[in-house]
Protein backbone atom coordinates (compact mmCIF):
# COMPACT_ATOMS: atom_id res chain seq x y z
CA UNK A 1 0.00 0.00 0.00
CA UNK A 2 1.43 3.39 -1.02
CA UNK A 3 1.28 6.73 0.69
CA UNK A 4 -1.45 9.25 0.05
CA UNK A 5 -0.56 12.90 0.03
CA UNK A 6 -2.86 15.42 1.67
CA UNK A 7 -2.19 19.11 1.02
CA UNK A 8 -3.48 21.98 3.13
CA UNK A 9 -3.65 25.63 2.15
CA UNK A 10 -5.87 28.67 2.46
CA UNK A 11 -6.21 29.30 -1.27
CA UNK A 12 -8.55 27.10 -3.33
CA UNK A 13 -6.61 27.65 -6.58
CA UNK A 14 -3.45 26.27 -5.00
CA UNK A 15 -5.39 23.30 -3.65
CA UNK A 16 -6.80 22.62 -7.11
CA UNK A 17 -3.24 22.66 -8.47
CA UNK A 18 -2.15 20.20 -5.79
CA UNK A 19 -5.05 17.91 -6.65
CA UNK A 20 -4.18 17.97 -10.35
CA UNK A 21 -0.54 17.24 -9.44
CA UNK A 22 -1.57 14.06 -7.64
CA UNK A 23 -2.61 14.95 -4.10
CA UNK A 24 -5.18 12.43 -2.86
CA UNK A 25 -6.85 14.99 -0.59
CA UNK A 26 -6.84 18.74 -0.12
CA UNK A 27 -7.97 20.78 2.87
CA UNK A 28 -8.74 24.48 2.91
CA UNK A 29 -7.87 25.29 6.53
CA UNK A 30 -10.07 28.40 6.43
CA UNK A 31 -13.13 26.25 5.73
CA UNK A 32 -12.35 22.85 7.27
CA UNK A 33 -10.77 21.57 10.49
CA UNK A 34 -7.36 20.13 9.64
CA UNK A 35 -7.25 17.59 12.45
CA UNK A 36 -10.76 16.28 11.75
CA UNK A 37 -10.13 15.90 8.01
CA UNK A 38 -6.78 14.15 8.52
CA UNK A 39 -8.40 11.75 11.00
CA UNK A 40 -11.17 11.11 8.45
CA UNK A 41 -8.70 10.42 5.62
CA UNK A 42 -6.52 8.15 7.79
CA UNK A 43 -9.38 6.22 9.41
CA UNK A 44 -8.66 7.80 12.79
CA UNK A 45 -4.91 7.18 12.84
CA UNK A 46 -3.55 10.61 11.96
CA UNK A 47 -0.81 11.46 9.50
CA UNK A 48 2.37 9.38 9.46
CA UNK A 49 4.55 12.25 8.23
CA UNK A 50 3.55 15.92 8.37
CA UNK A 51 5.56 18.72 6.76
CA UNK A 52 5.14 22.32 7.85
CA UNK A 53 6.39 24.49 5.01
CA UNK A 54 4.29 27.44 6.19
CA UNK A 55 5.58 27.91 9.73
CA UNK A 56 2.72 30.25 10.54
CA UNK A 57 1.45 31.17 14.00
CA UNK A 58 -0.55 27.98 14.50
CA UNK A 59 0.59 25.68 11.70
CA UNK A 60 2.97 23.60 13.82
CA UNK A 61 0.49 23.02 16.65
CA UNK A 62 -2.15 22.02 14.07
CA UNK A 63 0.21 19.47 12.55
CA UNK A 64 1.20 18.09 15.95
CA UNK A 65 -2.49 17.47 16.62
CA UNK A 66 -3.11 15.94 13.17
CA UNK A 67 -0.10 13.60 13.25
CA UNK A 68 -0.66 10.08 14.54
CA UNK A 69 1.23 8.14 17.20
CA UNK A 70 4.94 7.63 16.43
CA UNK A 71 4.60 10.02 13.49
CA UNK A 72 7.13 12.49 12.20
CA UNK A 73 6.66 16.27 11.93
CA UNK A 74 9.13 18.22 9.80
CA UNK A 75 9.40 22.00 9.76
CA UNK A 76 10.87 23.67 6.68
CA UNK A 77 10.04 27.34 7.10
CA UNK A 78 12.22 30.15 8.33
CA UNK A 79 9.83 32.05 10.55
CA UNK A 80 11.47 33.91 13.42
CA UNK A 81 8.16 34.41 15.24
CA UNK A 82 7.83 32.52 18.52
CA UNK A 83 5.49 29.53 18.51
CA UNK A 84 3.89 28.09 21.62
CA UNK A 85 4.12 24.31 21.70
CA UNK A 86 2.23 21.86 23.89
CA UNK A 87 4.98 19.39 24.77
CA UNK A 88 2.40 16.85 25.92
CA UNK A 89 1.35 16.35 22.27
CA UNK A 90 4.90 15.42 21.33
CA UNK A 91 5.61 13.16 24.29
CA UNK A 92 2.25 11.40 24.54
CA UNK A 93 2.24 10.54 20.83
CA UNK A 94 6.00 9.85 20.75
CA UNK A 95 6.39 12.23 17.82
CA UNK A 96 9.68 12.83 16.06
CA UNK A 97 9.93 16.59 15.35
CA UNK A 98 12.72 17.75 13.03
CA UNK A 99 13.81 20.84 11.20
CA UNK A 100 14.96 20.66 7.59
CA UNK A 101 16.63 23.19 5.34
CA UNK A 102 16.61 20.81 2.37
CA UNK A 103 20.39 20.99 2.16
CA UNK A 104 21.28 17.34 2.19
CA UNK A 105 23.75 17.66 -0.72
CA UNK A 106 21.05 16.70 -3.24
CA UNK A 107 20.66 20.08 -4.96
CA UNK A 108 22.98 19.11 -7.82
CA UNK A 109 21.13 15.85 -8.36
CA UNK A 110 17.80 17.69 -8.37
CA UNK A 111 19.09 19.99 -11.14
CA UNK A 112 20.20 16.92 -13.11
CA UNK A 113 16.75 15.34 -12.77
CA UNK A 114 15.10 18.55 -13.97
CA UNK A 115 17.46 18.79 -16.96
CA UNK A 116 16.85 15.12 -17.80
CA UNK A 117 13.09 15.68 -17.73
CA UNK A 118 12.66 13.21 -14.87
CA UNK A 119 11.41 15.78 -12.36
CA UNK A 120 8.27 17.56 -13.53
CA UNK A 121 7.92 21.02 -12.08
CA UNK A 122 4.93 21.95 -14.22
CA UNK A 123 2.79 24.32 -12.25
CA UNK A 124 5.39 24.89 -9.54
CA UNK A 125 6.74 28.14 -10.98
CA UNK A 126 4.03 30.72 -11.48
CA UNK A 127 6.11 33.77 -12.40
CA UNK A 128 9.54 34.56 -13.81
CA UNK A 129 11.43 37.84 -13.83
CA UNK A 130 14.76 38.71 -15.45
CA UNK A 131 17.52 39.39 -12.93
CA UNK A 132 17.51 43.06 -13.88
CA UNK A 133 13.95 43.27 -12.50
CA UNK A 134 14.79 41.57 -9.20
CA UNK A 135 13.36 44.40 -7.10
CA UNK A 136 10.09 44.19 -9.03
CA UNK A 137 10.03 40.44 -8.36
CA UNK A 138 10.59 40.94 -4.63
CA UNK A 139 7.89 43.60 -4.51
CA UNK A 140 5.52 41.22 -6.30
CA UNK A 141 6.22 38.43 -3.82
CA UNK A 142 5.62 40.91 -1.01
CA UNK A 143 2.19 41.69 -2.46
CA UNK A 144 1.01 38.20 -1.41
CA UNK A 145 -0.88 37.81 -4.67
CA UNK A 146 -2.77 34.48 -4.34
CA UNK A 147 -1.59 33.40 -7.80
CA UNK A 148 2.03 33.15 -6.59
CA UNK A 149 3.46 29.66 -6.31
CA UNK A 150 7.19 30.11 -6.91
CA UNK A 151 8.89 33.12 -8.46
CA UNK A 152 12.13 32.55 -10.35
CA UNK A 153 14.76 35.06 -11.42
CA UNK A 154 16.18 34.28 -14.86
CA UNK A 155 19.66 35.16 -16.05
CA UNK A 156 18.79 36.13 -19.61
CA UNK A 157 21.29 38.78 -20.68
Predicted region positions:
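Rossmann-fold dehydrogenase core element
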Residues: 72-74, 84-124
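C-terminal hydrophobic helical "lid"/dimerization subdomain
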Residues: 57, 61-64, 104, 108-157
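Bulky hydrophobic/aromatic packing residues
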Residues: 15-17, 25, 46, 101, ...
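Alpha-helix initiation/capping motif
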Residues: 27, 40, 99-100, 123, ...
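Short, small-residue-biased leader/transition segments that mark boundaries at the very start
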Residues: 1-6
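Conserved SAM/SAH-binding beta-strand->alpha-helix loop
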Residues: 11
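Short beta-strand "acidic-cap" motif of Rossmann-like dinucleotide-binding folds
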Residues: 7-8, 75
Amino acid sequence: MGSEMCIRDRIDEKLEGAKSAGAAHTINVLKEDLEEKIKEYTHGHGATVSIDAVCGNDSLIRLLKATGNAGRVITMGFSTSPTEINQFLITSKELDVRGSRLQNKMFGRAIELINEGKLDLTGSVSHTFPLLKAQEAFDFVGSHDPSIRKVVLTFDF
